[in-house]
């Protein structure tokens, strides 16, 4: 019975899931928007949001915890130097999931997961307003 077992299995074993979400979290932090399935996006939110909350208070211990979860020094640097200060006043909800139709081939529901308030998105909106 799966009573009180949270999280999706996604038809993978635990080490595969852990590696997949570690890679997806690194990609999301690096690029600030990625395209994936809706189920993976909803699970990825549970991985990335605590990382950003951790990055809001910069300390050696927090950097080591973030590195243990991502295994990528570049991502840890961006988390603590850019994203932590950017979301200092926001109490949570750092990601947004936008559904974008079905994948060609297997009709899996796809979605973009992005970081809220990313500078590229703000510049695009300002450019549209100027026209």
Swiss-Prot record:
The keyword Lipoprotein does not apply. It comes from the Bacteria. Keywords: Ribonucleoprotein, Ribosomal protein. InterPro entries: Ribosomal_bL17, Ribosomal_bL17_CS, Ribosomal_bL17_sf. GO terms for molecular function: structural constituent of ribosome. GO terms for cellular component: cytosolic large ribosomal subunit. One of its GO terms (biological process) is translation. Transmembrane segments: none annotated. The keyword Ribonucleoprotein applies. Part of the 50S ribosomal subunit. Contacts protein L32. Belongs to the bacterial ribosomal protein bL17 family. This is Large ribosomal subunit protein bL17. It comes from Shewanella violacea (strain JCM 10179 / CIP 106290 / LMG 19151 / DSS12). The gene is rplQ.
